[in-house]
């Protein structure tokens, strides 16, 4: 996953470096409208924190990059994680944010269900208390007459909360399936793999809530190897070419590969 892809030109930049997925930050205005693709200061070491685009305009650019037949089409780009910056919202605005997010995606990305972008979408929420965002989102797509698009949508709570607490939040939100579990920290700091291994164990238990596990932000070859050895399904990185190099090493080239559009992001991979 290419990290912090917040300008339209960066979509091509990261995919051309080897990414099959991108992560994009979404900020909200005071009325819970998705406003900009913007991270802000501070952000990862070695990156510009200030790139941004109007959210709806970014969605249109993303749609072009993920619609077969479009001149901007990137066939390798199959998944987009929206890092929802809901920290600016009150808890009671979460549901409204979900409703507005659904309407924006439906209109500007999915083209109202008429040959829109094909990428899978993961809604990544930093606060467990904002679980109503999920129901606001799913209910709105159903009310707008497009429940089939929920097959393209997954969920993540990104706050590094205890795995058991995350499971409870999903239960409240009515989610069973399509769950990606993130774990990580900015590349400026070190973080061990203890919680990653706990999430992988939940994924592989047969009765856990997790379908996929990803780790962020992974920029070094040694960290990439450690994450792959821990059994993650994906890593988020500022340097997709570094990840590609490690995946081509003798220890990994016959064990892991980049996912393609034919691989379901919601089905747990069985070894």
UniProtKB/Swiss-Prot annotation:
- Provide the primary localization: secreted
Identify the species of origin: Loxosceles hirsuta
Please state what class of enzyme this protein is. lyase
The reaction(s) annotated as catalysed by this protein in its Swiss-Prot or TrEMBL entry are: an N-(acyl)-sphingosylphosphocholine = an N-(acyl)-sphingosyl-1,3-cyclic phosphate + choline; an N-(acyl)-sphingosylphosphoethanolamine = an N-(acyl)-sphingosyl-1,3-cyclic phosphate + ethanolamine; a 1-acyl-sn-glycero-3-phosphocholine = a 1-acyl-sn-glycero-2,3-cyclic phosphate + choline; a 1-acyl-sn-glycero-3-phosphoethanolamine = a 1-acyl-sn-glycero-2,3-cyclic phosphate + ethanolamine
What is stated as this protein's family in its record? Belongs to the arthropod phospholipase D family. Class II subfamily.
What is the documented function of this protein?
Answer: Dermonecrotic toxins cleave the phosphodiester linkage between the phosphate and headgroup of certain phospholipids (sphingolipid and lysolipid substrates), forming an alcohol (often choline) and a cyclic phosphate. This toxin acts on sphingomyelin (SM). It may also act on ceramide phosphoethanolamine (CPE), lysophosphatidylcholine (LPC) and lysophosphatidylethanolamine (LPE), but not on lysophosphatidylserine (LPS), and lysophosphatidylglycerol (LPG). It acts by transphosphatidylation, releasing exclusively cyclic phosphate products as second products.
Tissue occurrence: Expressed by the venom gland.
Question: For binding Mg(2+), which residues are annotated in this chain's numbering?
Answer: 23, 25, 83
Q: Which cofactor does it need?
A: Mg(2+)
Query: What's one GO BP annotation on this UniProt entry?
Result: killing of cells of another organism
* UniProt keyword terms in alphabetical order: Cytolysis, Dermonecrotic toxin, Disulfide bond, Hemolysis, Lipid degradation, Lipid metabolism, Lyase, Magnesium, Metal-binding, Secreted, Toxin
Residues the record marks as active site: 3, 39 (nucleophile)
List the InterPro entries.
PLC-like_Pdiesterase_TIM-brl
| Cofactor binding description | Binds 1 Mg(2+) ion per subunit.
Q: EC annotation?
A: 4.6.1.-
Q: What is this protein called?
A: Dermonecrotic toxin LhSicTox-alphaIA2aiv
Q: Which GO terms describe its cellular component?
A: extracellular region
Cystine bridges: 43-49, 45-188
For this UniProt entry, the molecular function terms from Gene Ontology, in alphabetical order, are:
lyase activity; metal ion binding; phosphoric diester hydrolase activity; toxin activity
* Subcellular location as annotated: Secreted
């Amino acid at each position: 996953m290419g990290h912090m892809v917040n300008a339209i030109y960066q979509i091509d930049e990261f995919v051309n470096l080897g990414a099959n997925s991108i992560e994009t930050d979404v900020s909200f205005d005071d009325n819970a409208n998705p406003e900009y693709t913007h991270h802000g200061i501070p952000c990862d070491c070695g990156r510009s924190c200030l790139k941004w685009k109007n959210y709806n305009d970014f969605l249109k650019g993303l749609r072009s990059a993920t619609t077969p037949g479009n001149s901007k089409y990137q066939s390798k780009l199959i998944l987009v994680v929206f890092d929802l910056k809901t920290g600016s919202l009150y808890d009671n605005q979460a549901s409204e944010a979900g409703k507005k997010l659904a309407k924006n995606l439906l209109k500007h990305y999915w083209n109202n269900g008429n040959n829109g972008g094909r990428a899978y979408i993961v809604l990544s929420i930093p606060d467990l208390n904002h679980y109503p965002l999920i129901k606001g989102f799913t209910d709105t797509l159903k009310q707008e007459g497009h429940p089939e698009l929920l097959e393209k949508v997954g969920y993540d709570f990104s706050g590094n909360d205890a795995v058991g607490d995350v499971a409870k939040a999903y239960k409240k939100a009515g989610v069973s399936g399509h769950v990606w579990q993130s774990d990580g920290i900015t590349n400026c700091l070190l973080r061990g793999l203890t919680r990653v291994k706990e999430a992988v164990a939940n994924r592989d238990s047969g009765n856990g809530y997790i379908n996929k596990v990803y780790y962020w932000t992974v920029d070094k070859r040694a960290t990439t190897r450690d994450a792959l050895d821990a059994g993650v399904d994906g890593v988020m990185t500022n340097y997709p070419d570094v990840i590609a190099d490690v995946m081509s090493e003798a220890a990994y080239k016959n064990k892991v590969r980049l996912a393609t559009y034919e691989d379901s992001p919601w089905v747990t991979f069985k070894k």
